[in-house]
Amino acid sequence: MESYLRKWCLVSVWVLLLGLGFKVKAEPQVPCYFIFGDSLVDNGNNNRLRSIARADYFPYGIDFGGPTGRFSNGRTTVDVLTELLGFDNYIPAYSTVSGQEILQGVNYASAAAGIREETGAQLGQRITFSGQVENYKNTVAQVVEILGDEYTAADYLKRCIYSVGMGSNDYLNNYFMPQFYSTSRQYTPEQYADDLISRYRDQLNALYNYGARKFALVGIGAIGCSPNALAQGSQDGTTCVERINSANRIFNNRLISMVQQLNNAHSDASFTYINAYGAFQDIIANPSAYGFTNTNTACCGIGRNGGQLTCLPGEPPCLNRDEYVFWDAFHPSAAANTAIAKRSYNAQRSSDVYPIDISQLAQL
């Protein structure tokens, strides 16, 4: 009887609170979210660097309340995933995070960054993958200090999600830029992918050694379909550049194999592959299904396909931004980012992820 009355009282209080307009705050699905990557997910880390690769000016952020350093008109994929995971706030950039903010996670991504150290050097300063991992190690030391000891910190960090999206610049701003880099003369596409994956694995093992256990590894998108690639290498301005996409697929296949190997090697961790390439190809092949009318031109850019010069300060963008797959010469629009993020979180097809999607990763 006493138990029944206690339950009845709890239900009554709950109904009363709802009736008075109080909202019960739900906890996020994971305690924290750590992000490693390049301009696709950079949210301001390059703002303070001496770099051409910056997006801290209008019209970037036109649908986000103003420029923040995000290379989009609005949200990036990780912004959407942050919402889907139940966080109240977007994950802060490493360059601005302070105090206990780090407990919800940190975004270390840096525009022009690559797996190889020299990648993107022609654009100026950037935080390479290894540099981002070093910054994470500094964060771990702060987490230990806040939580009191290494055991508590380790238990906390193992429940967080670690999103890694690296490799695009190793092609865009390295391998396919022979005027600045010699890698295309040193390596075949297969050899180059092997080199990248070897370096990638080393950094993932470093993250593992510092507490990371839930990894979402995002494959390279179809770079050969970007307005910049179309402007330079597509005769009709519509057909994707196969030599670039072919190299990207080789890398992605190696990445899938690495996921299998790492899952076999670390029974206490989970690694999953996010097929951004496949999702992107599906959007381009079936644009109307996602509400798009333009798949090959930048909403903000200059020249052929809007891809010869990327979005410049003060340049007026297109008005129907939600109908464009690409925001600028290289980066997806907020609408495309949303579509890709949703498929990463809750896979529509078995080919979207391997072996599990991010919603399942969060539940582990």
Swiss-Prot record:
<dbReference type="InterPro" id="IPR035669">
    <property type="entry name" value="SGNH_plant_lipase-like"/>
</dbReference>
<keyword id="KW-0052">Apoplast</keyword>
<feature type="active site" description="Charge relay system">
    <location>
        <position position="328"/>
    </location>
</feature>
<protein>
    <recommendedName>
        <fullName>GDSL esterase/lipase At1g29660</fullName>
        <ecNumber>3.1.1.-</ecNumber>
    </recommendedName>
</protein>
<dbReference type="Pfam" id="PF00657">
    <property type="entry name" value="Lipase_GDSL"/>
</dbReference>
<keyword id="KW-0378">Hydrolase</keyword>
<comment type="similarity">
    <text>Belongs to the 'GDSL' lipolytic enzyme family.</text>
</comment>
<dbReference type="GO" id="GO:0009627">
    <property type="term" value="P:systemic acquired resistance"/>
</dbReference>
<feature type="active site" description="Nucleophile">
    <location>
        <position position="39"/>
    </location>
</feature>
<dbReference type="GO" id="GO:0099503">
    <property type="term" value="C:secretory vesicle"/>
</dbReference>
<dbReference type="GO" id="GO:0016788">
    <property type="term" value="F:hydrolase activity, acting on ester bonds"/>
</dbReference>
<feature type="signal peptide">
    <location>
        <begin position="1"/>
        <end position="26"/>
    </location>
</feature>
<keyword id="KW-0443">Lipid metabolism</keyword>
<dbReference type="InterPro" id="IPR051238">
    <property type="entry name" value="GDSL_esterase/lipase"/>
</dbReference>
<dbReference type="GO" id="GO:0005783">
    <property type="term" value="C:endoplasmic reticulum"/>
</dbReference>
<dbReference type="GO" id="GO:0005634">
    <property type="term" value="C:nucleus"/>
</dbReference>
<dbReference type="InterPro" id="IPR001087">
    <property type="entry name" value="GDSL"/>
</dbReference>
<keyword id="KW-0732">Signal</keyword>
<dbReference type="GO" id="GO:0048046">
    <property type="term" value="C:apoplast"/>
</dbReference>
<keyword id="KW-0442">Lipid degradation</keyword>
<dbReference type="InterPro" id="IPR036514">
    <property type="entry name" value="SGNH_hydro_sf"/>
</dbReference>
<dbReference type="GO" id="GO:0016042">
    <property type="term" value="P:lipid catabolic process"/>
</dbReference>
<feature type="active site" description="Charge relay system">
    <location>
        <position position="331"/>
    </location>
</feature>
<comment type="function">
    <text>Involved in EDS1-dependent systemic acquired resistance, maybe in phloem-mediated long-distance signaling.</text>
</comment>
<keyword id="KW-0964">Secreted</keyword>
